Amino acid sequence: LPEPLEVLRALFQLAVTLESFQHIAISMFRVTGALIFAAIVSISLAILSRTNYVFTVIIESNILIVLNSFPSIGWAILGVIWFSISDITVIFVEIMIIIPFCLINCIQGFRQVDKEIKEMGISFSRNRVLTFLKIDLPLALPFIIAGIRISYGIAWKIAIIAELFGASSGLG
């Protein structure tokens, strides 16, 4: 077993090499890409679920349950089987794991919009798209940002695991 000072020296030597910065940049690229894609999908599904009751049932009763109950290691194994060892594998695993966190917050954000304020916006502007952009989205934005922040932290944890299984570069 190496002494603590030897471990610190080795850590310092790794930290100052160009290769470690390349691995950090690769992991950051994967996490950022997965987070952007998951946020777009989550916001789109949340908007879809608020427009139609059938979509609400499908998204909340089926999609969220499947995504939440499937283990992280299962997504990693499926990613390697489907995409072999590549960047797509890692990004896929991250997306599948962080979508539920982002989606739940987005759905709750749109649910918290006061119906009276929304009706007032519709009666004054008579344009549902404008009402959505001026009332619904700004009022749901704190929830959306919270979901993205939670997903960002989880994405880094998952990136390490996914890179161990499905990538030859990155921090994992």
How does the language model describe each region?
Residues 1-36, 57:
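Periplasmic/extracellular loop-to-transmembrane helix junction in inner-membrane transport proteins
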Residues 92, 96, 129-162:
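Transmembrane alpha-helices
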